[in-house]
Every structure is written in structure tokens, then in C-alpha cells.
Amino acid sequence: MGIQGLAKLIADVAPSAIRENDIKSYFGRKVAIDASMSIYQFLIAVRQGGDVLQNEEGETTSHLMGMFYRTIRMMENGIKPVYVFDGKPPQLKSGELAKRSERRAEAEKQLQQAQAAGAETEVEKFTKRLVKVTKQHNDECKHLLSLMGIPYLDAPSEAEASCAALVKAGKVYAAATEDMDCLTFGSPVLMRHLTASEAKKLPIQEFHLSRILQELGLNQEQFVDLCILLGSDYCESIRGIGPKRAVDLIQKHKSIEEIVRRLDPNKYPVPENWLHKEAQQLFLEPEVLDPESVELKWSEPNEEELVRFMCGEKQFSEERIRSGVRRLSKSRQGSTQGRLDDFFKVTGSLSSAKRKEPEPKGAAKKKQRLGPAGKFKRGK
């Protein structure tokens, strides 16, 4: 889910923090991609007649087709992707995961009713609601990436948090995901729609955290409190407080604790056993991989092993897979050229002079808890 309504709120109150770019403008950029979010998109979008792609054994293959061709598209445009996979979800997320299970059970019932009624549109809608990324999907995509020569990382916990850590450490330019909580985890730059279908023709949206904080007049701790008020995966929000009201309250009172102290408890009851402090800590001190231990390497694809896996096991067209490998190899030759801004330091201009970012305080300054360095798999 991410943060409820955050993208629209930023567009309304801090529009200068959002840029829209064509994929070609990211030539030479390294980008950390939320793997689970991408795989979920592929399972939803890569379909034939409303159904996921399958081989003769009935195994789903939509995720592999999506991962193969979208990754090639990025490489052809000079982007160097590194996929980051989720680790163990934090305990705070258990409530949200339970709600998702309930929604899946309800969608299953509605799907059966739609099938009985022969309502094709409804059948497709509820079928997509039942899509879930499994360990097998993840493992197969990791195997595919290793054969393609594309690096991936296993995060100790939430992938978005480790993506944010890689951006903050300068290992990559941006984090790519549809989940806005990547900003709440502190990613300086967030890209949306990078792995979306070409058919949708969506421009890539680029969100800049420093500009968001400047426009709202908040520091990172206060921004985290705003996101908790909007609604996150980790704790309930206060009913009756909408996005604009949440912004007004945090700008005026500076913290959730002060807001709660001043709110009318009858009009705005605080959730029972509210875990907002735990959510604050999770956002400000997430368990992440150690960026300094990460060495990213993009290598030549293993054509014969790719054919064996994608064609022999998963029954894709050999001609198409070999064609894709040729495109991938060609893109590697072109992407060795760097960006001009990697060689020349920008000293500033009148139009883009940055104001000083509000200084974080307290817990925001504490070093993030580092999980295991993240099992790093290098493309062979």
C-alpha cells in the first residue's frame, strides 16, 4: 500500500518536487528497483486473453517475460538496474498482511460469483486482486537476472528501505518503486512508472525529497509523522484527518505527540494501542543492507543457459529469447559511456539554486540499523 494519498498530496502542495521525464533521459544512471513491486506489475500486466502466461505444465511465466523484456528495455536506454528483493517483513506489518489475507478471501468469493454469472470484466478484475508474488516467482526471477548478467540484492527486511539506503549512500541515482513510503524511508530520489508497460505510455515520475521538505517546511522526522497520519502499512491513522488537515496540523504543531495532545479525543479518537512510535522508529531506523558492502557489477549474459532456462524449461520462443540476448549484449556496449554530469561538477545556477534542507534532529540523525550485508548475487 505504501502511504495513502501521498503522491496526490505532493502534486497538490509541492508540485515543484515532481519531474516527468522520458526513459531516454536516464542514460548512464544506476537505479535500485523494488523487485517484488516489479514482479507484481508483471503478473498483473503480462497476460493473454485476461489470463497469466503459462507453459504446458501450467506454470506461470508472466513474471519472467516481464522481467526479461523490461530489463532489456532499461538497458537499451542506458539504465543500469539493480533489483532489490524483500527480506522478512517487519513485525509491525503483520496487521496489514492480515488485512490483505482478508481482502484476498473476499475477492475469492466475488470471483466465484462473477464466474457463475459469466461476467468476464468482473472475473478479470477479481482475478487480478488475487495476484500474489510467491517465493518461486522471486527465485525464478533471481535465476533469470543472474543469467542476464544483472545484479540483484537480498534486503534483510523491506526492499524499499534498502533501496533508499543505496540512494543515500550514492551507490545509485534513484529508487524505483510505486510505493511512496520509499520517500518516508529517506530516499533522496524516487522514480515511479519505470517498469510500467510501454503500452501505457506513462512518463517516469521523479520525486525529490529535499524539495518536498522545503516546500512543506518540514524536516524528515516531521515528514515521517505526516506519512503516519496519512496512513501506512505499519500502524493505523487517526480517523477524520484527511491529507490537507494532516499537513496543516504537522506544520502547526510539529509532531504527532503534540497534535494528539491538542486534538479533541471525542472528535478524533486515537486508535487503541496505537503503534505510531514503533512506526516512527521503523521509518527512521530501518533494517537495511550495508551499502558499503555492496559492489555492483553488470556482466555479459549467458546466452546458452538463458535459452536452456527460458526455452527448455519455460517454453518461450528460442528465436525471441536469442534476439533479446543480442539486444542485451548490444546495449551493454553502448551503456559503458558515462553521463556528462558524472565528469563535470555543477557549481549551481540561478534557476536551480537549492535552499538549505531542514536539519533532521533526534532519531533522524541516528545511524540506521544495518542488517546482514544482503546476500549479493553477481551476474555470471
Swiss-Prot record:
Residue list for modification Phosphoserine: 187, 197, 255, 293, 335
Cofactors demanded by this protein: Mg(2+)
Residues annotated for Mg(2+) 2 binding in this entry: 179, 181, 233
GO molecular function, one term: 5'-3' exonuclease activity
Location of region: Disordered: 349-380
N6-acetyllysine modifications at: 80, 354, 375, 377, 380
Listed GO biological process terms: base-excision repair; DNA replication, removal of RNA primer
N-domain: region residues: 1-104
Subunit-level organization: Interacts with PCNA. Three molecules of FEN1 bind to one PCNA trimer with each molecule binding to one PCNA monomer. PCNA stimulates the nuclease activity without altering cleavage specificity. The C-terminal domain binds EP300; can bind simultaneously to both PCNA and EP300. Interacts with DDX11; this interaction is direct and increases flap endonuclease activity of FEN1. Interacts with WDR4; regulating its endonuclease activity. Interacts with POLB.
PANTHER family: FLAP ENDONUCLEASE 1 (PTHR11081:SF9), FLAP ENDONUCLEASE FAMILY MEMBER (PTHR11081)
Protein name as it appears in the record: Flap endonuclease 1
Taxonomic source organism: Ovis aries (Sheep)
Name of the coding gene: FEN1
